Structure formats: structure tokens, C-alpha cells
Swiss-Prot record:
The keyword Transport does not apply. This is Uncharacterized protein aq_155. It is a multi-pass membrane protein. Keywords: Cell membrane, Membrane, Transmembrane, Transmembrane helix.
Length: 386
């Protein structure tokens, strides 16, 4: 329960930072905070909820599915690292930098926290690595997919470590941290892809054929990034092309195929958890479509991001309720609990629709009205499921 407890704690603190983000931008209240504190709170929100929180939940799944006891010695660095990350955000230390993959605060406390947290991730990946290698080919589908997350979690800190030693420190701080976290950050996205597919399989609660040749795509690109970090400038055209193809092929093909398979299987015998699966897959397919449509940098990038994140979050929320019931903390899901995943989708939808950018405001308004009407009808039937 160590990692599950860290998941709950980090999500709660990440949510508190989200509240601080809103207050720090509110006229009349923003003056209560130091200048640019908004960015510290934003870093705290993303790093606590979407990095620490999702990783803690994933490692909890490793222990649960691979049936291994937790080890406090390998958990402690991650716990201490999280407190240092959250503390440096809360107290506004250093300079907050809104770079990709690991939003950063330029301060020794933050760097120490990030290092300790990823050390905890690395130590746990070492504990599960023998089982991951064994189950990649011969295990069931869930264990095979989780094995890819173990392998990639082993590679990611090593990629960051190599990047630290061979990334030149120039005058442009933003470019330095972009290069530092580029390949390792993309490996992290492969971890998230493996987590997402695992969520779908767990919510489906039915056997799915193990397509190990697709699972191979989830590890081939991170292995390539590990070696590319040694020889390539991550921000070169070759480095960016490599990571773009990783998204399109390495993540896109396995997630879309498994998403469609679980979607078809889920609609036969819908219940609350399978309805969440349908919602999660639908969101992901929408986000993936926007991702494939992106050319350069436009406002579809945040729309793609929020939609994909929503697909992960609704699955995590549903599984959290499932496990809380199994642990005896909840007897039955009420209407409020059932509405929480749906409300998460609504928030991310409005963030995405505000960012999608290419359509006229009139068209966006009509689309929003139609989707709101459809989702209201779906919610009424959703809340009635046992």
C-alpha cells in the first residue's frame, strides 16, 4: 500500500496546486502571491499529479499484478523526492521554467527531489526487471504490457543520466532543459502508453490476445532513444524526427489497435467500469487523431495533450474506486463517485475545445452545444449503472 498511498497523496497535493494556480490568476487575489508564483504552482501541479501520481499508481500495479511485496528501501527515495519537488513549488524557490516533459524549478532542492524520485523509480524497475523480461513474450497480455513499462522505466533514468553529462550548458536555459529532458521525456510517454493500455485491460476484465509484436514497438523506440542520447543532439532535426516517428508508430499503432480491440469487447456487456473504458478509448482516439493532424506548433497541441491525459485520468479514477471497494474503504459507488470521471472529461473537453483553434467561434459554440446535450443524456444512463 506504500505506492498506492503515495498516489493518493500526490494526486491530492497536485489538486491543491491546481487550486493555487487558479487563485494566483484571480484578480484581487493574485496580489497575495509573489510575482510569477503562478508558474511555481503550475510546476507543482503537473509534477505532483501527472509525474509522481501516475508513476506511483503504475508501480502499485506492478506489485499487484506481478505479486511482489513492497520494499520500503526502494520506496523511500521516491517519497523524499516527492516532498522536495512539492516543497520547492509551494515555497516558490528558484525560477520556475515551463519546459516540456518535466516542468522545472531551477533550484538545488528541486533537482535533488527529481533525482531522488527517479532513483526510486529506477530501483523498483530493477526489482521487477527479471519478471518483465520473462513475461514480455510468455505472459498474458496485461503482464506483457506492464513489462514494457518496467523496461522503459529502467531505461528512462539512465537516459536522463547520460543527458546530464553530455548536454552542453549554453546561455539559453530553456533550450538546455528541453535538450536535457527530450529523449528521456519521450521514453516517459511510452511508459504512459503502457499504463493506458493496462488500464483498458483491467477495466475490460476479459482476456485479450497478447500481440507481443505490437508490444515490441513500445520498447524498441525507448531503446533507440537511450543510444541516440549518446550520439545525437536531441533537438537536432534527426533527434526530433526520431521522436516524432516514435509517437506516430511506436505509441500510435499499439495504443490504437489495443484501444479498438478493447472497445469492441467492452460494448458487449456494458457496466460502469466498461463504460469508463469506452469513454477512455474514445477520448484517446480523438486525441490521437488530433496528434496525427498536428503540423509544427499550433493550438491543436494542447487540445491533443488534454484529451490524451483525460483518457488516462478517467481510467485511473475508475480503477482507484475499484480497488478502494476491494480494500473495504467503499461499499458501493454512489452517483457522486460515478460522476467524478465524467466531470474530469468535461473539464478537459472545454480546455481542449478552447485550444483547438482552427474552427470559428460560431462552429465551436454549435459543436459544444451538441456534445453537451449528448453527454448529458449519456450521464443519466451512466449514473444508473451498478
Amino acid at each position: 500500500m506504500l505506492w498506492f498511498s503515495l498516489f493518493i497523496l500526490s494526486i491530492a497535493i497536485g489538486g491543491s496546486f491546481a487550486l493555487l494556480v487558479a487563485i494566483a490568476r484571480t484578480p484581487g487575489l493574485a496580489d497575495l502571491f509573489p510575482p510569477k508564483y503562478f508558474y511555481h504552482a503550475l510546476v507543482g501541479h503537473v509534477d505532483s499529479a501527472l509525474i509522481v501520481g501516475l508513476y506511483a499508481f503504475l508501480i502499485f500495479l506492478w506489485h499487484r499484478i506481478f505479486e511482489k511485496k513492497e520494499n520500503f528501501a526502494s520506496f523511500l527515495p521516491a517519497l523524499l523526492g516527492f516532498f522536495m519537488i512539492a516543497g520547492s513549488s509551494l515555497f516558490g524557490l528558484g525560477q520556475a521554467l515551463w519546459n516540456n516533459y518535466v516542468p522545472t524549478i531551477i533550484h538545488p532542492v528541486f533537482f535533488g527531489g527529481v533525482s531522488l524520485f527517479f532513483l526510486g523509480v529506477f530501483l523498483n524497475s530493477l526489482r521487477f526487471l527479471p519478471q518483465a523480461v520473462k513475461n514480455f513474450y510468455i505472459g498474458d497480455t496485461l503482464k506483457s504490457i506492464l513489462s514494457t513499462t518496467v523496461i522503459n522505466s529502467f531505461l528512462m533514468p539512465l537516459t536522463y543520466l547520460i543527458a546530464y553529462f553530455n548536454t552542453p550548458k549554453g546561455e539559453n536555459v530553456y533550450e538546455y532543459f528541453e535538450a536535457l529532458f527530450w529523449f528521456g521525456g519521450h521514453t516517459h510517454q511510452f511508459v504512459n502508453a503502457g499504463l493506458l493500455i493496462s488500464l483498458w485491460l483491467l477495466l475490460l476484465r476479459r482476456e485479450v490476445l497478447n500481440l507481443w509484436f505490437l508490444n515490441l514497438l513500445l520498447v524498441v523506440f525507448p531503446i533507440t532513444y537511450f543510444f541516440a542520447q549518446i550520439f545525437l543532439n536531441p533537438l537536432s532535426s534527426t533527434g526530433k524526427s526520431l521522436t516524432t516517428w516514435g509517437y506516430m508508430v511506436g505509441i500510435g499503432i499499439p495504443t490504437i489497435v489495443y484501444g479498438l480491440i478493447t472497445l469492441v469487447r467492452a460494448v458487449k456487456g456494458l457496466d460502469f467500469y466498461r463504460s469508463i473504458l469506452v469513454l477512455s478509448v474514445s477520448l484517446y482516439l480523438l486525441g490521437a487523431l488530433m496528434g496525427y493532424m498536428i503540423v509544427g506548433m499550433d493550438t491543436r497541441v494542447p487540445a491533443h495533450y488534454h484529451t490524451v491525459i483525460a483518457s488516462i485520468l478517467v481510467g485511473v479514477i475508475a480503477l482507484t474506486f475499484m480497488y478502494l471497494q476491494e480494500l473495504g474503504y467503499m461499499e458501493k459507488l454512489g452517483k457522486f463517485e460515478k460522476f467524478i470521471p465524467f466531470s474530469t472529461v468535461l473539464v478537459c473537453f472545454f480546455l481542449s475545445s478552447d485550444s483547438s483553434g482552427r474552427e470559428s467561434l460560431e462552429l465551436q459554440g454549435k459543436l459544444r452545444e451538441r456534445i453537451t446535450y449528448k453527454t448529458q443524456r449519456f450521464t443519466y444512463s451512466w449514473l444508473s449503472w451498478d
